[in-house]
């Protein structure tokens, strides 16, 4: 939550057991008391036990027409996802899209994994009012994002945009630090010794050099395929992710800390 815009109000939905577990955190209770976070239960006639049940849940019209109202945006943030506070990107950059998630096809024009995704509630309502997903068919993210991409008024993020949002197994463009130093140490004016950047989010030569040449999405999604080699598969890549996005340690099993970025299976 600390990586999301401060004016966002969030809702956590879960079973009675999961809501109780989350509410044991003092930090969570503080957010609830401040009105930043709302804890609520998944309706008793719905389930998230397994991929098919999740797909049914997330393609149920009443979820969007009633339960999520008055929200216009749904950020799906599953337990194998993480948003990186160090990223130069932020969630506000993607608010104009009806769907954005880690792309299945970097050159594609629609679609992205739903495990870490941002979705338009009103556009999903339009889809579900006109069509119903058949049980045991395509996963909800494939089913919904395809139909959102077919809407004449829809705007689904393409592969290149989606790669800046979330990294799963496809790799986006590397970061570049300008060769021009932004540190003014001339001593000739009142700005001596100050840092200046051309645009918010610009990297500073001499400070951000460690980010040169690395892919740094806003967040990461592990997914059912595990930690893919294209993102995590070398010791160098893992060391950089640990420095760039230490929050990512929270989506790995704790015993991985000994090996990432350690020497066990350095490449895969």
For the regions a language model picked out, list residue spans one by one:
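Short, acidic, metal-binding catalytic loop of nucleotide-sugar glycosyltransferases
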Residues: 1-8, 28-30
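Short, conserved loop/helix-junction motifs that constitute active-site signature segments
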Residues: 2-5, 66-70, 91-95, 119
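Short, hydrophobic beta-strand segments that form beta-sheet elements in well-ordered domains
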Residues: 9-15, 99-102
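Active-site-proximal specificity loops/subdomain of glycosyltransferases
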Residues: 13-72, 86
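Generic structural signal for small/hydrophobic residues in well-ordered secondary structure
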Residues: 79-80, 120
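Conserved donor-nucleotide/metal-binding helix-loop-beta segment in metal-dependent transferases, i.e.
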Residues: 81-111
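Catalytic core and acceptor-binding pocket of nucleotide-sugar-dependent glycosyltransferases
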Residues: 109-268
